[in-house]
Structure formats: C-alpha cells, structure tokens
Regions:
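A conserved acidic beta->alpha catalytic loop
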Residues: 39-49, 267-272
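Short, acidic, metal-binding catalytic loop of nucleotide-sugar glycosyltransferases
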Residues: 24-33, 254-259
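A recurrent flexible, glycine/aromatic-enriched loop bordering the glycosyltransferase active site
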Residues: 134-156, 207
Length: 352
C-alpha cells in the first residue's frame, strides 16, 4: 500500500464540469497526494465522474459515497475520519490550484510544529496566465481561521480536537471555532502564501431566512464558547520605549489569536524599526499604522473617529499607562491585558 504525504479531501455535490476541472488540477499539481472524494449524494453524471477518477488513480484515491446530501461540513468530517497521512487538505470542488501550491504549506509544517491549520494564497478570481507556474515569493503570517476553499490541517489537530462543528454555518463561525479549539490544544493558524489558488464563491443553498437563522445561531454558539471578538485602537506616544512596545505587541498577538483585532498607532521612527523586525506581519488581525511626522495632540481624536466609523465598537487604548492617548474614553493598557489573560485562563486552559 502506498503512503501519501497528504490526503486531499474534496466533498462533491453535482456540478460535474467544475468538479472535473478541480480534480484534474489537483492531480496535476499535487504529486504524491491521495484524493479522498466524498460523493455527497450527487446525480448520476457526477457519480460516474468520481468513479472514473477513483478507478484511474487506484491507490491514490479513496471514494466515499452517500446516497443523500450530508451537508458540506459533515462531508468534510467524513473525509477527515479516513485520513491516513500526516496532513489533510480540504478543497472545495470549485477551487483551482496552481503549480507549487502545496509546497509552502508543507514547508511551514516542518519549520513550525505548532502550525495546525494553514491556508494558501487565495484569489477570488480566475488565475492569470503568469500565475500558472513559477516560484513566487512566500509570505507567512498568522491568521484568525482557515478557509474551506483550500487549507491544510495537521492530522494531529484532528486527532486531538475532532472535526468541524456540524451544527454551525459551514463558513466563518465554524472555521473560527475550529481554530480556537486548535489554539486550546496548542496549535496555531497560518497563511503561507506562495502560488495562488483560485477560490470561487459557492452558490447559496436554502432560503435566505434559513441561512440567516443558521448564521445567527452559529454566532451565538461561538460567542458562548469563546466570548465576544472586539476591536482595539492602541496608541503609543513618541517617547514610548521600543522594548515596551514589543512586549505589548506580543500580548496583542495572544489577543489576535482569540479573534480580537488591533490597529496600533506608532510614530514613523518606531514604525520603521518594528516593520524591519517583522512586527507588521505578526497576524492579520494586527495592523501597524504610521502616524504623521508632525502629529498634534488633537489629531488622535480625529484618527480614532475615522477608524471607529468603519469599525463599530472600536475601543481606544493608551499604549503606555499614565500617558493619555488624547482621546476621550481611552482605556488603560492594563485593562486590555487583563481581558486577554483572563480569556486564556478561562477559555484556553492557560495558567497566567
């Protein structure tokens, strides 16, 4: 029996033309992988297509069939339960991968053993010709959650926490919940972006009313487990000690892993140092913003108002306790620290 480096799960429900294109690309650009094809109650034409691929690939394919549609998330979990490789990828039937798409993801698993969920570079548009091949530069950063369009999951994560929550929405809330459970188990979620993967929005199934009901129920279940995700604007004055800023960015990284988002306002000299040291790409939920060189005290409020207009509920935080951010209602950093540390203890089992 051949042992593959990775098993790729593709849940399929009808749409044989898209499915064939997806599978042809996967076979061409995923050498050594085994395909786990989950026939999710498809019509006869699609069923024949899957049987054709499974027969042609022999030991490089496993076909799982259901006579009715299990739902996407349950189909993914059926595939995960049959994974034998060290890593599993989940790919939607409408996704098109390109040459070299897997290498950055698997490379990251070797250099970062705590990487539990990894997404490739996803593009919500057809791939351009210049993207089909070559070796683009690879960028790596932590992200809030995976993506069902394409992602890699370490089998050790599945063995530890189980599959995706089948009662959730099969989208953002379900993916966030999985990454939070992975975090509780000691695993992180990354994007390792090299060769692009074309992701197409899936057709919406069911009535708008039922979809909205499921979305609200999923959001409520997520918040009950993990708490509210909040947005913060953290201001550091010109005289702030760079080492203190680094320590506080490390704390914000822990908060970003819990789903919080941060806009960090720093002066140009500090911004340059932090960007050079990689603090600008710690996590997609942390954004460094460079303040104007000639920054007056009154401008802080204007910046906060502008940021708050696009982010309801934004909380302004003074990066250095005792030094006002110049914005009415700003909270001390110690309060933010207590929030993050308390969640780690209560939700993630970490001792302060």
């Amino acid at each position: 029996m051949i042992t593959s480096a990775i098993d790729i799960i593709v849940p399929v429900w009808n749409r044989p033309i898209e499915t064939r294109a997806c599978l042809v690309n996967l076979v061409e650009h995923s050498p050594g992988a085994r395909l786990i094809l989950v026939n999710n109650g498809s019509d006869r034409e699609t069923e024949n297509l899957l049987e054709e691929f499974a027969e042609a690939l022999d030991e490089r394919a496993l076909l799982i069939s259901s006579r009715f549609n299990l739902g996407f998330v349950r189909a993914v979990n059926c595939g995960l339960a049959r994974v034998e490789a060290e890593f599993a990828a989940v790919v939607r039937q409408s996704t098109l991968v390109s040459e070299g798409w897997l290498e950055p993801l698997l490379m990251l698993t070797r250099t970062r053993p705590e990487a539990g969920v990894i997404v490739p570079r996803l593009e919500r548009a057809p791939l351009k010709k210049e993207h089909r091949g070559g070796s683009p530069p690879i960028s790596t950063t932590e992200v809030s959650h995976g993506d069902f369009a394409a992602m890699v999951v370490r089998k050790g994560v599945y063995d530890l926490i189980g599959g995706f929550d089948e009662e959730m929405d099969g989208a953002g809330w379900c993916l966030k919940d999985f990454s939070r459970r992975a975090l509780r188990g000691g695993f992180l979620t990354f994007a390792a972006e090299g060769s692009p993967v074309a992701a197409v929005d899936e057709p919406l199934l069911g009535s708008a009313e039922r979809r909205e009901e499921l979305l609200l129920r999923s959001a409520a279940a997520y918040r009950a487990r993990w708490g509210e995700e909040r947005a913060f604007c953290v201001y550091f004055p010109r005289e702030a000690d760079p080492d203190a800023i680094r320590q506080r960015l490390d704390l914000m990284l822990r908060g970003a892993r819990q789903g919080h988002t941060f806009v960090v306002l720093v002066f140009p000299a500090t911004f340059k140092v932090l960007a050079r040291e990689g603090y600008g790409t710690l996590h997609r939920n942390i954004r460094l913003e460079k303040l104007p060189r000639l920054f007056g005290a009154g401008q802080a409020s204007k910046i906060a108002v502008a940021l708050g207009a696009g982010t309801p509920g934004l909380v302004t935080v003074a990066g250095v306790d005792g030094i006002s951010a110049g914005i009415p209602g700003s909270r001390p950093f110690a309060e933010l620290e207590r929030l993050i540390v308390a969640a780690e203890a209560e939700k993630y089992g970490k001792v302060p």
